[in-house]
């Protein structure tokens, strides 16, 4: 059974940071996806007996994702016994806000451990989830309404990832960048509001590599970096052109 556990130090830091809009963690490994956080004054060692438990939540089902935090809300996914994926929303005190079903996830009959994979990406009033079956789901953050659900395998002619798609999609301005892994579509960018395809990586057809893309700068140049099945690649985020 999946459980969220947050310790009092973590909750206090996050709660105070949200008030100054500096402590949100809207995607996997922090705001920039690099594992860096702006909080200061953290304890250098635990007190005797460990940190005090602030709250915990049971009944989330199975999953391998990380929680994300934005605007005073914690979001996390889990899969129930019917192999259905759910997105849960909690306050910073653990109080439930809502949960919503967003479709099937890889269950016990799949080739890998059952459960959700992708960590939710939060962008303002929208949340984006990549399911283990390659479906990009857009959810409204306030009440959990599913706005769109796009089958990326069907759209880009991609094959199912053996162990389930596992990525936290990248939002860049008005684009959602993901890795369908189809012919001429190792990566693709979709309009974050309409779901229409903006670009795909022509000439690059490697399958997805269970990796979350990062946006970096090298001088004045912006690059999207990610791992595919057999290569580390750099993509122009504006055009989808393979740079190296």
Predicted region positions:
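Bacterial N-terminal signal peptides
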Residues: 7-16
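Noncatalytic, solvent-exposed loop/strand surfaces
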Residues: 18-244
């Amino acid at each position: 059974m999946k459980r969220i556990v947050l310790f009092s130090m973590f909750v206090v830091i996050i709660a105070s940071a949200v008030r100054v809009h500096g402590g949100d963690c809207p995607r996997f490994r922090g705001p920039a996806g690099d594992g860096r956080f702006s909080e200061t004054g953290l304890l250098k060692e635990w007190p005797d007996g460990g940190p005090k438990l602030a709250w915990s939540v049971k009944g989330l089902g199975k999953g391998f994702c990380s929680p994300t935090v934005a605007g005073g809300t914690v979001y996390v996914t889990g899969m129930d016994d019917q192999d259905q994926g759910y997105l849960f929303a909690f306050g910073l005190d653990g109080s439930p806000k809502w949960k919503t079903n967003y479709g099937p996830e890889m269950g016990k009959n799949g080739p890998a451990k059952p459960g959700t994979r992708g960590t939710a990406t939060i962008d303002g009033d929208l949340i984006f989830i990549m399911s283990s079956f390659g479906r990009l789901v857009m959810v409204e953050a306030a009440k959990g309404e599913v706005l769109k659900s796009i089958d990326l395998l069907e759209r880009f002619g991609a094959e199912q990832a053996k162990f389930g798609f596992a990525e936290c999609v990248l939002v860049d301005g008005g684009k959602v960048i993901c890795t369908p892994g189809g012919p001429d579509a190792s990566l693709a960018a979709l309009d974050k509001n309409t779901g229409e395809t903006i670009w795909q990586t022509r000439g690059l057809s490697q399958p997805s590599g269970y990796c979350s893309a990062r946006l970096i700068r090298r001088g004045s140049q912006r690059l999207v970096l990610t791992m595919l099945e057999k290569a580390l690649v750099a993509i122009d985020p504006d055009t989808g052109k393979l740079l190296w």
